[in-house]
């Protein structure tokens, strides 16, 4: 993989400028393929060109600015987080977006997966069918694994203990749904676990030691079995070895969320 391929922002791959589109189409290992929460599966050169054209037009019409949040690039998979700020009917809107890029051994793109909640767009949460199969061998290490076990068990104390003193969880809706510090986190997770724990099917991860992006399927909330729904979260490790941040993407909890 050359340096330009390794460090190319995933956002630019999903929403290219017109002069870059031909080169981007050629950068896929086979035909372009991506999964978008609204468009669904987009596969093939023609479909990808239509998608890219529509998205570029939307970015322009909505006066969108892009705030970089974070990224991690590994040999075969990487992710990027951004926040889109754009003009809404009642003022500025922000939409957190995460993008995962799978690449072949030659650095060419195999698949792109996009995660965001539809709530900031239209006030609705829409369950998204699974994009990936669960990987039974996938195990998260250190504090990320501790958090996942506490989440599955519905253990409020253990979840809160996994965070740094000033750590936070950001819900998919964005900055208006941030729970920072142990007291705020405790209140949030007490409500979240009111019906029990939230075990996830772990499907794929990107972990560079500082951040861990986990793609998963939500299949159960407490005692309630749910239709499998795709989601993604990014966990940032702090200097103290605990979580500095947990940022959630998508509407996997659309059918079960108590808040």
Each predicted region: which residue ranges?
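A beta-strand edge to alpha-helix "cap/lid" segment located at domain peripheries
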Residues: 53-141, 186-259
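Short, low-complexity N-terminal intrinsically disordered segments enriched in polar/charged residues
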Residues: 1-26, 119-161, 257-259
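A solvent-exposed, acidic/Ser-Thr-rich amphipathic alpha-helical stretch
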Residues: 5-7, 21-77, 157-158, 162-210
